[in-house]
């Protein structure tokens, strides 16, 4: 009788272990296919980012003579190039993050820890310096503007997940914590977590909600003056990593060759959050055998999974059009080129 009770207790415990936090991966009940079409005369050497404003696609390049190329959808050709690469006046060093509005631009020189505001003329693609050069802490990796005077920064910080910065690059406050899906992850130093959970952002101005995607986790954070509060955290793919700390810095990487590469980009609209997902594994990537096509995972701003879009190509970076009906991307066809991905409806 005693042995039967032990077996019964063990059987009841199995669901508890199988449903541990590390296994609560997001799932979708709906999926749809999407067809890609390469645009004419739209080749890119090493793509970094792509954004759409009106008729123009702005494609970032890592090693071109210019770091930003302007492609006209109506003319189906590159019509201009911006951000000449170099170390002279009005030149830029790769890699850069760029943010454009109708009349302004914000350029972040990521590996040189500086940023600059500009006025922007969309008619002739000219930019003009505005204000002083912003010097950023060397611990910052990515920045994202959420208003005219506030920026969210991620990087490798000892005591927080995010920094909130003002227009001069000053730290206004510190916010946020990291996921703890890996067993014992809560004991890992913040600096190692920051190296592994590198973030990309999108922002909903109406909701004042920040979307943050790492390779394995999607998070929604509510912004109130000078602070971020976690609204929802979703596991995109299970992960496990190891880290090493020494006087020269911190090193962290996945130690599971069969783990999926996971999220590779994020785009947002007023209605949805889109995550560019790579289902290939670390092993497939190392052996240059990535046979699975990219997917786009769609969520609403409450974190509800809406559908999975299965594309027919490998996508490096992407953005969504204003109507939530098509995606513009840099894809492999087989060379890097700008294309459009149209889901079936």
Can you annotate each of these PLM segments?
Residues 43, 88-90, 238-248, 301-321:
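Conserved blade-ending motifs and adjacent loop-strand segments that build the rim/top face
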Residues 276-292, 337-341:
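Short, conserved, GDST-rich strand-edge loop motifs in beta-rich repeat architectures
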Residues 77-111, 132-134, 312-316:
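Blade-loop segments of beta-propeller domains
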Residues 23-45, 304:
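A short helix->beta-strand "capping" segment at the edge of beta-propeller domains
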Residues 47-52, 96-100, 142-147, 191-206, ...:
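Structural signature of eukaryotic scaffold interfaces centered on beta-propeller domains
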Residues 37-67, 267, 271-281:
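Beta-strand-rich domains and repeat architectures in extracellular enzymes and scaffolds
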Residues 16-18:
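C-terminal motif of bacterial Sec signal peptides marking the signal peptidase cleavage site
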Residues 164-166, 289-303, 342:
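Beta-propeller blade signature
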């Amino acid at each position: 009788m005693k042995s039967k009770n032990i077996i019964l207790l063990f059987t009841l415990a199995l669901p508890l272990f199988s449903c541990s936090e590390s296994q609560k991966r997001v799932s979708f009940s709906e999926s749809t296919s999407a067809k890609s079409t390469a645009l004419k005369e739209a080749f890119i050497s090493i793509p970094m980012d792509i954004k759409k404003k009106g008729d123009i696609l702005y494609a970032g390049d890592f090693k071109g003579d210019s770091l930003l190329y302007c492609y006209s959808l109506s003319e189906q050709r590159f019509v201009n190039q911006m951000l000449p690469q170099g170390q002279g006046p009005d030149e830029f060093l790769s890699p850069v993050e760029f943010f454009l509005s109708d009349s302004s631009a914000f350029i972040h020189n990521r590996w040189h820890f500086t940023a600059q505001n500009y006025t922007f003329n969309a008619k002739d693609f000219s930019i003009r310096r505005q204000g002083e050069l912003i010097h950023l802490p060397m611990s910052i990796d990515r920045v994202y503007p959420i208003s005219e005077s506030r920026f969210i920064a991620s990087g490798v910080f000892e005591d927080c997940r995010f920094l909130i910065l003002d227009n001069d690059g000053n730290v206004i406050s510190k916010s946020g914590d990291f996921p703890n899906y890996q067993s014992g992850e809560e004991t890992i130093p913040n600096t190692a977590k920051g190296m592994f959970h590198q973030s990309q952002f999108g922002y909903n101005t109406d909701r004042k909600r920040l979307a943050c995607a790492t390779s394995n986790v999607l998070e929604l954070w509510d912004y109130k003056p000078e602070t971020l509060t976690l609204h929802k955290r979703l596991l995109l793919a299970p992960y496990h990593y190891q880290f090493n700390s020494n006087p020269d810095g911190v090193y962290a990487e996945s130690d599971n060759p069969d783990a999926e590469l996971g999220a590779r980009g994020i785009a947002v609209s007023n209605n949805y959050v889109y995550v560019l997902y790579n289902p290939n594994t670390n092993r497939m990537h190392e052996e240059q055998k990535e046979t699975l096509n990219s997917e786009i995972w769609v969520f609403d701003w409450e974190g509800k999974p809406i559908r999975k879009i299965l594309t027919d190509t490998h996508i490096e970076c992407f953005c969504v059009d204003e109507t939530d009906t098509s995606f513009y991307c840099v894809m492999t066809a087989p060379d890097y080129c700008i294309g459009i991905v149209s889901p079936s409806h």
